[in-house]
Amino acid sequence: MDLDAQRAELTRLGYAIVSQDDEGIVATRSAWYPDAIASRLRCVVFVRSVRVLDMSILTQDRAHMLAAARELLPSVLPRWLQKSRAVVAVYFADAVDPDARAFCESPQALGPLESLFYPAALDRSSGASYYWQGTSLWGGVYFSKLRFLVRRLTGPTAGPAREPVSVYGVVMTVVVAALLLQAIAAFVYLAVRG
């Protein structure tokens, strides 16, 4: 399958193309998001063309892609320190097995070293896209951005051209800022009272 449209869209969105062959594309990007508690999302995108997407492919690819992401975007920072790594796997398949569809449409547990695996599939025979459309609590500030990326890759001319603001991230930023201001006010009050 020709993946030129996906390559162009990844490039337009600021991703660096790491590799490309007849079966897929690998791209990376690191970006800071003030609307996501001022955190940095490091994203590795794998776009693959397969004949039939089934659980054996997803299981093998998940392990391989998470390991590749650690090599492509290494970090010396502790796991909890204002950084996240997302692995987005977008499959273009002639057919999608029902178990693979269910896997793509369900929330994924965090991978090793807090890498989030976000699979999606486009069934070329029906034109249907399958990906999880919910938002989990952990890493939730990024899900609107990941869904946007998947929509743009499965239909590069569909939907908005710019990443959406993370409403969940804005709410969390306001909550954290309010708590920080309360802590500062309490510290000043106690310091003045002696």
Regions found by a protein language model. Give the residues of each.
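N-terminal, charge-rich interaction modules
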Residues: 1-52
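Switch/connector loops and helix/strand junctions flanking conserved nucleotide-binding motifs
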Residues: 55-56, 97-102, 130-131
